[in-house]
């Protein structure tokens, strides 16, 4: 899978890749981690299943896999970039809002947040998100798009997703 365009856009706001740290929150297969590490960014890639991430880390010393259940994981350290693509919608509203707040708090001032959130019949943007995003970030981009998904292991048939995209700089 290819890197998400919002991650490419977000990385451009970093001043010096070689001195930057990124948190890939819910890294999955590592598609965003690989892109960031190849830029020279030090990446903490966190997911509950890190088998694929560990394989990537063998060949790329900039990727540091961490096995964790994000619903109760305490973020350690500060970051210049936080990436959370299509992960928070799987949590209940209170947990998703707390996780977004934790991600905000681990960002350095001027740090970049790249967030995507699937919206559909099951998933709605949690009430607390708007308050956090508008009060803590200078918005670079915020939009909702419908995308075509060719299918994946959980749902192999082609289908669409409505996705909320947010790119912001921490105030």
Predicted segments with their positions:
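A short glycine-rich, Lys/Arg-flanked "PGG" loop and its adjoining helix->strand segment in the class I
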Residues: 97-109
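Class I (Rossmann-like) S-adenosyl-L-methionine-dependent methyltransferase catalytic domain
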Residues: 1-23, 28-74, 91, 95-98, ...
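A conserved beta-strand element that flanks and buttresses the S-adenosyl-L-methionine
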Residues: 83
């Amino acid at each position: 899978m290819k890197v998400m365009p919002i991650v490419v856009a977000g990385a451009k706001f970093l001043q010096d890749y070689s001195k930057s740290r990124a948190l890939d929150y819910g890294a999955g297969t590592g598609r965003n981690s690989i892109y960031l590490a190849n830029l020279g960014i030090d990446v903490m890639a966190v997911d509950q299943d890190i088998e694929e991430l560990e394989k990537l880390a063998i060949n790329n010393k900039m990727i540091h896999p961490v096995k964790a259940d994000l619903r109760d994981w305490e973020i350690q350290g500060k970051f210049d970039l936080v990436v959370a693509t299509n992960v928070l919608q799987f949590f209940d509203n209170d947990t998703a809002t707390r996780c977004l707040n934790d991600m905000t708090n681990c960002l350095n001032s001027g740090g970049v947040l790249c967030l995507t959130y699937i919206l559909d019949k099951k998933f709605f943007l949690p009430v607390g998100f708007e308050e956090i995003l508008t009060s803590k970030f200078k918005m670079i981009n915020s939009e909702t798009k419908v995308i075509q998904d060719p299918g994946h292991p959980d749902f192999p048939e082609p289908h669409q997703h409505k996705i909320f995209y947010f790119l912001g700089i921490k105030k």
